[in-house]
Amino acid sequence: MKNGIDVSYCQTKVDWNKVKAAGIDFALIRVGYCYNNGALKIDNMFKSHMAGATAAGIDVGVYLYSYATSTTAAKKAAQEVVKVIKQYTLTYPVCFDIEYESIYTGGSKRVNTDICKAFLDEIEDAGYYAMLYCSKDFLDSYLYPAELTAYDKWIAQYASKCTCPHPYGIWQYTGTGRVSGIAGNVDRDYAYKDYPTIIKGMDKTQLQKQQLPYSVIISGSDLNSLKDQISKKGYFTFMSDGKLCVGKFATVAEANKTAADLKRKGFTGAVGKW
């Protein structure tokens, strides 16, 4: 488990060396927010936070706060984010932050879910590790969790433990944390996956189009080779009823969408939905 924070324009005075010395391993930095049409407004502190955190040796990822009202807008927002972050080396995910705005609470689960998928798919297609941020309640109340199983999640729940029934990789456990080097409150997070290693294993130049060797009946060394190659892309692999299951989560239930997800990335061969 790794200790982290997430920061934005709300944290204007940060001594990143002190933050590092305080035991913070990673920071998720707000790249900005998108308007209803997907246009990006960059956070006033984004560049400063990115420079300070990386100079201090802290792993970094980014998140976008969303006001997107359509899949077209969400895709545009993702494209704008990619333009901004391509100059940086990210070792944590690129996150889509969807919260209790009236456009979502007054909208439909169908539209909200499609907006999330549109952004996350666009980010993944650009070769980045995509993640959905929302609260535990928002996920069940305003989205269709069963349609979001292929995406890792950063769950907000301010409690002594996270009781989200859906798999997640990061838990935001308080909005009033205190860390040496930061004036005032800051969000605190725990990461339960080794994101730097996973992301390092993702070859962005090959992720979008990858041909895997296979046999008509995969077994033995062929199967092991396939498992190894898929694992290097940040997926878990496991056997169920004699079949190779693949996903970003290590359970059968959470692997159901992965065949379509892999095919969209260009994998071909013995990839099927079981």
Label each PLM-derived region with a short phrase:
Residues E101, D137-D140, A159-T163, G175-R178, ...:
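Short Gly/Pro-enriched loop/turn and capping motifs at secondary-structure junctions
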Residues G127-S141:
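Aromatic-lined carbohydrate-recognition surfaces of secreted/lumenal glycan-active proteins
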Residues L64-S66, C134, K273:
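Residue-level recognition of beta-strand->loop/alpha-helix junctions
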Residues M1-N17, A21, D25, A146-K209:
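Functionally critical loop-and-helix segments that line ligand-binding/catalytic clefts
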Residues V82-F96, Y100-S102, L143-P167, K265-G266:
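Structural recognition of alpha->loop->beta junctions
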Residues V60, Y129-M131, K153, Y235-T237, ...:
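Hydrophobic anchor at the start of a short beta-strand
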Residues M1-L120, E124-G127:
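Substrate-binding cleft of extracellular glycoside hydrolase catalytic domains
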Residues K2, T205-W274:
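Acidic/polar low-complexity segments and flexible, solvent-exposed patches
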